[in-house]
Amino acid sequence: MVSIATSIIALFSGLLAVWAQFRISKSNRDFESFKLLEMKRLDSEFRSGIYKEPLLNAAFDLQSRVYNILNMNFFEVYYLLGSERQKHYAINNTVFLFSQYFAWAEAVRIDIQYIDLGSSEKTRELSLIQRYISSTLQTDRFNPVLMVFAGEQRAIGERMLKSIDGKVSCMGFGEYLSSEFDLHDPLIEMLTDEMKKVSSNVFEASERLSALQHGLIDMLDFLDPDFIRYPKERRKKV
């Protein structure tokens, strides 16, 4: 009887040891899975911040300039009636703002899988807004002034983007001017010529610019729905 009892105890102890080992092993696997998911989430948030914030800022800067062109006589004041310095700034900075938006739109288009919007549906919505903006600039249903084909938009964006130590960034306005980038790139020359046409007759480009500004506002509302970065009163559609 003692031998049987001893055997039962040994068997029970063995089963407990196996069960404990199984629980430890499962716990370790669960922890590793959790750790991998958490690392993936943090990496996604990090990459999301790399793209979302610059895209948001670029969209705001461009829509603000378009609003000023259409509603505040920006080109009349600073290009048609301005000094040489003001004329230079009015054209070149506006071309830069378009190019800056193209850059971050291209970066997002390439790495859209890294933009953490919480669901694939929201990611698709961002893509739809981007396509609307791109189509607005390339469509021939408006006056041909400021018509920029999708391939040209992407090419300009590619030229503006930089990668330093694996980090994506966009050329700043100072670098844009000091590198004389605007003087030697045929697509920038094309965009500059189109902008000069707009400055001479804003009405010809008003439909395209209005549709563009509306699309950019939609992007702001999508990326910053709670008006944390930019208040609602600074997002008026023309």
Question: Which residues make up each language-model segment?
Answer:
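Conserved non-transmembrane functional hotspots
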Residues: W19-V238
